[in-house]
Amino acid sequence: MKITIFKITLLLTFLLGLESYSQNIILSERTKISILTCGTGNESYSLFGHTALRIADETTYIDVVYNYGAFDFNTPNFVSKFAKGDLDYFAITHPFNDFMADYTYEHRNVYEQELALPLDLKQKLFDNLNTALSSGESVYRYKFIDKNCTTMVIDIINTTLGEAAISKKTTSELTYRSILYPYFDNHFYEQLGTSIIFGSKVDAISDHIFLPLDLMENLKLSTFRNQKLVQTETKTLLNYAPLVPSSWWNNGYSYLIFLGLIVILNLKIINQIYFFSMGTIGVLFVFLGFYSGHLELANNYNVLLFNPLLILSFCFYGATQRKWLYYLALFSLLLLVIYIVILINKVHFLIVLPMIFTNGYLLVKLALKHNKRISIII
């Protein structure tokens, strides 16, 4: 407890000192303000890259990076707050060399785009950043699409400039889901997991910048006061060949083998566990849709596949002929057909198709078993 209080006190003292210090610093004409775009990595937190702001002034010996992607793992109820959308993210600063050392260690690319701003706006942005750090204005509730390290950098720059100089310039009819999907290539179960946990919001056409690499491309087209906002070529500060991860289990083959064994073995206990797992995941989706502040999780039509009613099939799977289980199976099959109609033009249709087939096969068997008009041994 004493260590925690000491750390908080030290941090507040540092931030207050930083604000006071920055207000006394007058940036020189040699000041450069740039946006750093960090390439993707193979860890879950790095799959989409990262955005940060760099302010460098040789005259005042400043070379600092402002990073809006920090959070505290020691936050009480971390997992529940993250799920609910109540987890606070915040900005921190790094010496530029330390920032680069981290990405050198992770073998991730870093690109730099210098903003063509007059000195007074450079000073204003510098002051705004430090005031936000010390006042707590840099603390924000993370939202996957609407509020993240990229959108926060865009917001503070546009606020400083007094106009939406940085906005989506590239034209595309892609949905948020379609944009995100390729980022999970070579990470099969992450791709599958995000495909089924995201709801209808991510099927909307993307109308704003929310990813680092997207920001980098749009900056090339952005203007301010009838001039290009980035007038120099994008600099590559770090460049590494992409590392393609390999895993004996995190791939589509293990997924197909697993579902194939369920169908081929046709064991009562396995079928029961499958129905229970699918239904439980569906209950989780419904719960998150109401509980979570992450709008991306709301209105999740994937619950038609992960049908909570399947839990009843688990509970009474081995029962003798029950007419209501027959109708339950038919109703679940109807929901599955509706799901296919909704999903058929979505980017994640193929990845969930094996589960659709498995569900359909097991539900047909369940319906036949509990239809008194058909005598069949299963």
What kind of feature is each model-predicted range?
Residues 50, 63, 112-114, 150, ...:
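Extracellular structured ligand-interaction cores
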Residues 131-312, 322-325, 329, 333-378:
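Activation targets extended, charge/polar-rich intrinsically disordered C-terminal tails
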Residues 13-21, 286, 314-317, 366:
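Hydrophobic membrane-targeting alpha-helices
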Residues 24-26, 57-62, 116-121:
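A short, structured loop/turn motif at beta-sheet edges
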Residues 28-108:
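Glycine-rich catalytic cores of cysteine/serine-nucleophile enzymes that process amide/ester linkages
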Residues 72, 76-147, 151-161:
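A cross-kingdom signal targeting lumenal/periplasmic-facing segments of multi-pass membrane
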Residues 25, 44-45, 184-186:
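A general structural signal for short secondary-structure junctions and capping/turn motifs
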Residues 1-25, 372-378:
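Bacterial Sec-dependent N-terminal signal peptides
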